[in-house]
A protein has these predicted regions:
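Class II aminoacyl-tRNA synthetase catalytic cores and aaRS-like
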Residues: 1-115
Length: 115
């Protein structure tokens, strides 16, 4: 008998928000039938959370706190990937989208507005 997994909990979460819920989360197995390789597996665990009216800075802080908690629970002092290392307990650098484009792609995003 065929078995099915969600591709994303986003639609169900947005329906709950539209129905008046203010704070929700979903943690569960999801499926994406796309690329497959050492960095991509079709089945994985996804966390999504929403808070109505919350500033994006608070959500960025949530992400930093979540990474620090995951590292602490795993007993890790740092995260390493492809020769790079990050301290999950340090205050993260915050960039605007325009700053990220300039730094990492050499594109002045603001200069393209109205061009």
């Amino acid at each position: 008998q065929p078995l099915y997994l969600h591709t994303s909990p986003e639609f169900a979460c947005k329906k709950l928000l539209a129905a008046g819920e203010k704070r929700i989360f979903s943690l569960g197995s999801v499926y994406r039938n796309r690329e497959r390789g050492p960095l991509h597996h079709p089945e994985f665990t996804m966390l999504e959370w929403y808070r109505v009216g919350e500033a994006y800075e608070r959500l960025m802080a949530d992400c930093a706190e979540f990474l620090a908690l995951a590292a602490a629970k795993a007993g890790a002092k740092s995260f390493r990937f492809r020769g790079r290392e990050a301290d999950p307990f340090a205050e993260p650098e915050r960039l605007s989208v325009a700053e990220a484009f300039m730094r990492h792609a050499g594109i002045d995003l603001l200069a393209t507005v109205g061009a």
